[in-house]
Design a protein with these regions (language model features):
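Short, catalytically relevant binding-site loops at active-site mouths
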Residues: 27-29, 151-152, 160-161
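The catalytic Nudix box helix
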Residues: 155-172
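Hydrophobic N-terminal alpha-helices or hydrophobic patches in metabolic proteins across all domains
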Residues: 2-122
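Alpha-helix N-cap/loop-to-helix boundary motif
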Residues: 14, 123-125, 162, 166
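N-terminal strand-loop-strand
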Residues: 121-156
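Short, well-structured alpha-helical interface segments that form or flank functional binding sites
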Residues: 40, 126, 169
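Short, glycine/serine-rich, charged loops/turns that create anion-binding
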Residues: 49, 65, 136-138, 150, ...
Length: 172
């Protein structure tokens, strides 16, 4: 099969299943920075060429034992703003949609490496916190509701930022 080149910022693989060949299993030291130890499995998708002209890299979440290869679903794209490549986040199918897939948790898990890069995390799932806000006027309770771009009406909420807890999100 011929190699396929992926453009930087491409999010078309979100939600898709890929096979990853692991070249840095859990516990492996970074080849250029031996003080960095991988707490998760890390590998690449054979045949998919990323912005660095190497095969597309994938962080594997949710499997604590060292692997050689694994089939995962891509749940997030880490776009490095000061680098020429993106990183993907993959999880086993049975973990898709669980809290490990939330943007705030992904950022915490990959911080061991991504702390050195300015980046954004585009995840399929994000943890949100909402609040029921109301006031009373003339003995009647009035609720604050918002109408989003799709026309749905709901309570105000926001996504949990990296390092925040639920209360901090609500206050913000």
């Amino acid at each position: 099969m011929a190699n396929v080149t992926i453009k930087k910022g491409d999010k078309s693989f979100l939600g898709k299943e890929v096979t990853v060949e692991i070249d840095r299993p859990v516990g492996t030291h970074h080849p250029k920075h031996p003080d960095i130890v991988y707490p998760i499995n890390y590998g690449f998708v054979p045949g998919l060429i990323a912005g660095d002209e190497e095969e597309q890299d994938v962080y594997i979440l949710g499997i604590d034992k060292p692997l050689t290869n694994v089939v995962v679903t891509i749940v997030a794209v880490i776009e490095r703003l000061n680098d020429n490549e993106d990183k993907w986040i993959g999880v086993p199918n049975e973990l898709v949609g669980t809290p490990i897939c939330y943007e705030c948790n992904i950022n915490k898990i990959i911080d061991f490496q991504e702390q050195f890069y300015k980046h954004t995390c585009d995840a399929i799932y994000e943890k949100t916190c909402g609040a029921v806000m109301y006031t009373e006027l003339n003995g009647e309770r009035l609720y604050l509701l918002i109408k989003n771009e799709s026309g749905h009406i709901g309570f105000p909420k926001g996504h949990v930022e990296y390092g925040e807890n639920e209360l901090q999100t609500v206050v913000r």
